[in-house]
Amino acid sequence: MYYPINEIFQTIQGEGYYTGTPSIFIRLQGCPVHCKWCDTKYTWKCNNEDQISYEKIIMKKKSNRKWSYMNVKEIILIIKIKKWTAKHIVITGGEPCLYNLLEITKELEKEDYKCQIETSGTELIKCSLNTWITLSPKINKKTLKTSILRSNEIKYPVLKKEDLFYLNSILKKIKNKKHNLIFLQPISQNEEALNICIKTCIIKNWRLSVQIHKYLKIR
């Protein structure tokens, strides 16, 4: 299977449960969610005029709308050519679950990688059983119950106090599932949002995710 790849790079995971973990990011093109505050708007559309060769994907220095169709063998080849040492792989987007991720996650596991998918939960999740699912629900799009139940952690973006109402409605749907890993993440390092997240995390015994890669000014 071929996937529309926007970029592949090695860095440190800056969000959620795996914060601080050396990771290889595989960013897929295409997203129907369109959050106003999204910091990867260049992944929204999969326009033919933006398609380039996969060799050029390797050379990308800056994030942009350019993408390339790549199969799993080509993706693994790039990782080996680059001699990247991280063993944790983050499949993100865009919305990666627009695509069937079963093949890519299984093949990467055969190469001794641990896979993580970052998803809004608006699409069916198709991946290996061992893949770690980071669910990031969005108020403007319905979150599938199957996605909520499959998730290993919920990483919820917060801008104002009212945003927490939607999270509470989601948690009610899975009241029979013990979900210890709930992260609140202030949007765009907004100070008011940060204070809301800190106070709520303390009250609820949830966790705080602050996107450390942005503070460290790394990719």
Curated annotation (Swiss-Prot):
**Residues noted as binding Mg(2+) in the record, renumbered to the chain:** T40
List residues binding substrate. Answer: I12, Q13, G14, R27, T92
Give GO BP annotations, semicolon-separated.
queuosine biosynthetic process
Q: Which reaction does it catalyse?
A: 6-carboxy-5,6,7,8-tetrahydropterin + H(+) = 7-carboxy-7-deazaguanine + NH4(+)
- Identify the cofactor(s): [4Fe-4S] cluster; S-adenosyl-L-methionine; Mg(2+)
- Co-factor remark: Binds 1 [4Fe-4S] cluster. The cluster is coordinated with 3 cysteines and an exchangeable S-adenosyl-L-methionine. Binds 1 S-adenosyl-L-methionine per subunit.
Amino-acid positions noted as binding [4Fe-4S] cluster in the UniProt annotation, renumbered to this chain: C31, C35, C38
Taxonomic superkingdom: Bacteria
Q: Which residues bind S-adenosyl-L-methionine?
A: G94, S136, P137, K138
GO MF annotation terms: 4 iron, 4 sulfur cluster binding; carbon-nitrogen lyase activity; magnesium ion binding; S-adenosyl-L-methionine binding
Q: Which residues form a coiled coil?
A: none
Family matches, as PROSITE patterns = RADICAL_SAM (PS51918)
Enumerate the InterPro entries for this protein: 7-CO-7-deazaguanine_synth-like, Aldolase_TIM, rSAM, rSAM_QueE_proteobac
Q: Does the keyword Lyase apply?
A: yes
Keyword Endoplasmic reticulum applies: no
Pathway assignment reads: Purine metabolism; 7-cyano-7-deazaguanine biosynthesis
Q: Which PANTHER family match?
A: 7-CARBOXY-7-DEAZAGUANINE SYNTHASE (PTHR42836:SF1)
Q: Which family does it belong to?
A: Belongs to the radical SAM superfamily. 7-carboxy-7-deazaguanine synthase family.
What is the protein name given in its UniProt record? 7-carboxy-7-deazaguanine synthase
Natural source organism: Buchnera aphidicola subsp. Schizaphis graminum (strain Sg)
